[in-house]
């Protein structure tokens, strides 16, 4: 949104003021600058337009199986609120995506997060692999490491990362070989 673009530019200007030259001659952010950078990253992760774009891009897959949606561990700003008015009542991105896919698009979806027990996640993985009762998993960071679900064919990544390990892990979830899977698709927002 325009408000998000303005806030992004403002955070960027503030970060520029927080650059300092290190002993090695390279520039780095001060602690204050790092906090501003985190705010800017959260703003990008929770951008409202990502939800609109997801709805548009996922429509051709509405009846498919083995879909994965990675969400940011962030809240999405209500377009009618000011950026300074964010509070605990704002919805988490994962909840908005779950509502969009499950209620609006009538898809069979489930969240796959640290809130689900180990046993619940095992059941979700089995159901997802079968594809009969579960079309899509909606996750935050729970699938970053140590989870093997090779049947994932299509991923929608709303939470990109600059961490190389996380970047590779998230794509690796989709790019694994699986019986009957000839290719994989990744949409990175």
Stretches found by the model and what they are:
Residues 1-65, 74-92, 98-99:
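Interdomain helical connector at the RecA1-RecA2 junction of SF1/SF2 helicase-like NTPases
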Residues 4, 74-76, 117, 143-144, ...:
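Conserved nucleotide-binding/hydrolysis micro-motifs of P-loop NTPases
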Residues 7, 151, 166-170:
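Alpha-helical scaffold elements adjacent to nucleotide-binding pockets in ATP/GTP-utilizing enzyme cores
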Residues 20, 24-30, 55, 60-61, ...:
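N-terminal helicase ATP-binding lobe
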Residues 120-122, 164-171:
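Short, charged, surface-exposed secondary-structure boundary motifs
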Residues 173-189:
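Conserved segment of the helicase C-terminal RecA-like domain
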